Amino acid sequence: MQDTYQPAQIEAAIQQQWANEERFKAVVNPQKEKFYCLSMFPYPSGKLHMGHVRNYTIGDVISRYQRMLGKNVLQPMGWDAFGMPAENAAMKNQVAPAQWTYQNIAEMKKQLQSLGFAIDWSREITTCRPDYYRWEQWLFTRLYQKGVIYRKLGAVNWDPVDQTVLANEQVIDGRGWRSGAIVEKREIPMYYFRITDYAEELLNDLEQLDGWPERVKMMQRNWIGKSRGMTIRFPIEPESQKGLSAENAQFLQIYTTRPDTIFGVTFLAVAAEHPLALAAAEDNPALRQFMTECKTGSVAEADLATMPKKGMATGRFVTHPLTGKRLPVWVGNYVLSGYGDAAVMGVPAHDERDFHFAHQYGLPIVQVIQTEKDLPAFNADSWQEWYGDKEEMHVIASDDCNGLNYDQAFEKLSEKLAALNLGEPKTQYRLRDWGISRQRYWGCPIPIIHHDDGEALADTLPVVLPEDKIPDGGGSVLAQSPDYYECRFQGKAARRETDTMDTFVESSWYQFRYMSPHYQKGMLDPEEVAYWQDVDQYIGGIEHAILHLLYARFFTKLLRDEGLVHTDEPFKKLLTQGMVLAGTWYREQEHGSKIWFNPADVQVKTDDKGRIIGGVLLSDGKPVQYGGMEKMSKSKNNGVDPQALIKTYGADTARLYTMFTAPPEASLEWSESGVEGAYRFLRRLWAYCYEFRHSIAKPSEVVPLNEKHQNIRREIHEQLRAARFDYERNQFNTVVSAGMKLFNCLNEIEPDYDALRREGVRILLLILSPIVPHITETLWQALDFSGVISDQALPEVDETALKQDNMTLVVQINGKRRGEISVATDAAQQNIIDCALADERFAPYLAGLTVQKTIYVPKKLVNIVAK
């Protein structure tokens, strides 16, 4: 054992030992309880960031702790390797995405391994390899045959210059990110999953997920968006039916969650793609031009919500189903063609969007809801929040519905509209079917062949993606590659589908493929699936709360219905780790933009309380402005390189710092002094163990503990109990605190009590081993403890050590603390009170007073009330 802590040397040696022994290889063992711990797998960008380090350290600590509880732990790792960033990098570097991706994977794997994670690398998966995505294609064929996957027209962002489809994030201010051209909305054939068929189950099963943060469950509830409303049909006037097909000519149908406001409808709005709008535009050039404008811009809902609302009258009219009034139909750029009926009723008095739209175009505003709260009266010139409420409201100006609240009006209107066959109650979901077609190269090929008579499933799987293409940004690479798409079907020329699947598909089922990554007889090995079942603990960022987690839940139900898994939900518990923050520094340019500098390049100035008051750039000595703590990012240039950190301090310091500085769910504010503090603690631990090892030539006699050392042993086991409790709660910062307190206890043990020192060191190393596995494994072996530390059980608390012969109680007189007394732990209440009254130290406070009563709070205090 070296006399100084050399992290690089010991970490390399321990990692090699683990690898040689396949220490963390997971094998099915029906005799042991399983624990499957999974952190969201990374995109292989080529470089780890501190968010990765924190995420995977949390998962590793949980995995190692569960291993100490005697469970058979599976902690795998893989690569979410398809996606647009690889295509962008390929264009920039003129290299095939496959080459770029595989190089990055090799580099990132080394970085992950340098952190000492207890990963079973034999189960590594890479989603861009055919041995993974072939089973995705196989499942596609099954679901396509059953109608769970279908094809229809879907709206996309189209760049008319680059002649390519753009993802929502590639549309910036309505323009293509590369060409700068105004983006158009286009409809093209796409493949969809019928996720809406599972909407109710996805919603209801959230109640089973007791181990998920309530915030995440609420986000999913809102995304699924179950609503109780009503379908209402507005008869189209005869002269407005021109150009409409028979099925579209009779009614304009809408869905609303506020049927109680139906008497306030003053117009209807339809999407530019609605049949009525298309018919009206046939002989209306101005309307046709406006509808063309509506088809420009992003199809992303977030963009649609913030864009200016515009409209144009169609010249067509419908009849109000209850009043018979004539209502104009407008085309509105805010109405979504792919959602509901692509038509909405306009109630300006009680919908903020409709209110501003009506003011913009001079449409009537009719109040039909009155508040029962003490609020300002309705004013058609100024929007107030209560106009849109439905709680503590009643209906007015609505015939025989007057005076009714929302629920009463809903029932009344249901009856009235049903009697006229013009409406009925309906439950609707915000969730829409999942369009998986992507007009991109670097993704899983869709196994479809198009031929003269329609389309068919590919008869040979996998349909292998060529890995030698280099995209140029000018449209789909596969659509420009005859060597890929040209094929034959039943002896005739045919064309292979050139769209690829949404990369969320790969990450929706990877948790199950880890169970049998090399299985060739099917998508999943039944024996492995029966044992591992589901993920016991999942770890990842809150940014994945909706799409990834919802799609993974959906896929689990699909796989269950195919008989491939036997669980309804993929992840029993979910931990969403907080962000890693760091200080930001910048200089503002003349034109208003900012140049950001890395904190490592800044000399920070602080006041006498340690607060930042400024800084200067080390390279030129000139001032830079402090921008506060923000999430580490490339854009703010405030990242910390994990590899540089590991090189300087070691992986255990990085792990200790990230676990100690903040609870897992909270944001972590980066501090160089904090990193140095973690490193100092490990050096002190090493030095203590070195001194201990060399101070004992042979096992010493067990010396009976005096009162001081009984108290030290009690404190050791108190901290062990605290650490065990906090491990169960994933509060690793307080686990480290308990370890540090325990370490302080060790320093109080006198030389003659080596048996107690050895017990304390053993407990300390075991407590810290999930967090700092390299140093604890090394010290464990150096101190000749049996076996290896990663195979040890978590130590049990010795309850006898926690028992105290005496306890200390506070003594109060008339509620004021006057001192303490020491009494036997098992003393009777009256004896305790008598002891307090007899103590001469309290006599001056009772002089001239008569004791009225005494109050005893068990194990805490005695209060003497005297007058």
Curated annotation (Swiss-Prot):
A motif ('KMSKS' region) lies at residues 631-635. Its EC number is 6.1.1.4. Keywords: Aminoacyl-tRNA synthetase, ATP-binding, Cytoplasm, Ligase, Nucleotide-binding, Protein biosynthesis. It catalyses: tRNA(Leu) + L-leucine + ATP = L-leucyl-tRNA(Leu) + AMP + diphosphate. Its main location: cytoplasm. It comes from the Bacteria. It is found in: Cytoplasm. InterPro entries: aa-tRNA-synth_I_CS, aa-tRNA-synth_Ia, Leu-tRNA-ligase, Leu_tRNA-synth_edit, M/V/L/I-tRNA-synth_anticd-bd, Methionyl/Leucyl_tRNA_Synth, Rossmann-like_a/b/a_fold, tRNAsynth_Ia_anticodon-bd. Gene3D superfamilies: 2.20.28.290, 3.10.20.590, HUPs, Isoleucyl-tRNA Synthetase, Domain 1, Valyl/Leucyl/Isoleucyl-tRNA synthetase, editing domain. GO terms for biological process: leucyl-tRNA aminoacylation. A motif ('HIGH' region) lies at residues 42-52. It is an enzyme of class 6 (ligase). SUPFAM superfamilies: Anticodon-binding domain of a subclass of class I aminoacyl-tRNA synthetases, Nucleotidylyl transferase, ValRS/IleRS/LeuRS editing domain. NCBIfam families: leuS_bact. This is Leucine--tRNA ligase. It comes from Dichelobacter nodosus (strain VCS1703A). The lineage of its organism: Bacteria, Pseudomonadati, Pseudomonadota, Gammaproteobacteria, Cardiobacteriales. The gene is leuS.
